[in-house]
């Protein structure tokens, strides 16, 4: 456990640099701790979808060797649910999606080009009739898109990102 008295947010980020993954508890004594934490990062907002078809299968994609869900960055002037729908369509080729409602918001941090980012992803439950051919968006390093049975979820998530596991928390 780290507290703001012991360590600034910036010092905390430097301390965890080099860890591949993990959970860290960081207490910030502030009326708005998230806002205080965000100051150390460049905030990236994104939208994504948990898409199910009539058979109850879930749409996954494989990106850089890991199973993932379709998601992407919010564009200027775009609503976050529109972003989620657009990203699912672009990354998988699925059209005619029904956005059923917000599922969860996840956060993760990463370092790129010597800069730290906080990615806030808004996840939505979606439905598709599943008739379209899946078309992985190669320019986003997506190798394959596939409808997966929910009973395979636990195994799939072992080769995934920890923030994605939060999206399915309580499902198995």
Predicted regions, residues:
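Conserved beta-strand and immediately adjacent loop positions that scaffold enzyme active sites
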Residues: 48, 57, 144
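Charged phosphate-binding loop/patch that engages nucleotide di/tri-phosphates or the phosphate backbone
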Residues: 163-172
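Active-site beta-strand termini and strand-to-loop segments that position acidic
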Residues: 51-54, 126-128
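Acidic, metal-coordinating catalytic segment for phosphate/diphosphate chemistry
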Residues: 5-48
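Short connector loops at helix/strand junctions that flank enzyme active sites
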Residues: 42-47, 64, 119-121
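Unchanged
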Residues: 74-162
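Intrinsic-disorder-associated interaction segments
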Residues: 2-5, 157
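Conserved Nudix-box catalytic region and its N-terminal flanking loop in Nudix hydrolases
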Residues: 2, 52-89
């Amino acid at each position: 456990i780290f507290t703001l008295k012991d360590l600034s947010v910036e010092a905390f980020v430097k301390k965890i640099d080099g860890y591949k993954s993990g959970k860290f508890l960081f207490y910030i004594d502030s009326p708005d701790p998230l806002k205080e934490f965000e100051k150390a990062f460049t905030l990236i907002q994104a939208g994504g979808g948990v898409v199910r078809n009539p058979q109850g299968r879930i749409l996954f994609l494989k990106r850089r060797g890991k199973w993932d869900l379709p998601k992407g960055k919010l564009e200027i002037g775009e609503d976050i649910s529109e972003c989620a729908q657009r990203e699912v369509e672009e990354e998988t080729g699925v059209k005619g999606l029904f956005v059923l409602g917000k599922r969860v918001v996840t956060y993760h941090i990463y370092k790129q080009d010597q800069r730290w980012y906080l990615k806030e992803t808004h996840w939505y439950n979606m439905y598709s009739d599943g008739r379209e051919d899946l078309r992985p968006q190669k320019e986003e390093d997506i190798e394959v898109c596939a409808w997966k049975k929910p009973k395979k979820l636990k195994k799939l998530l072992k080769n995934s990102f920890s923030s994605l596991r939060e999206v399915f928390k309580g499902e198995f």
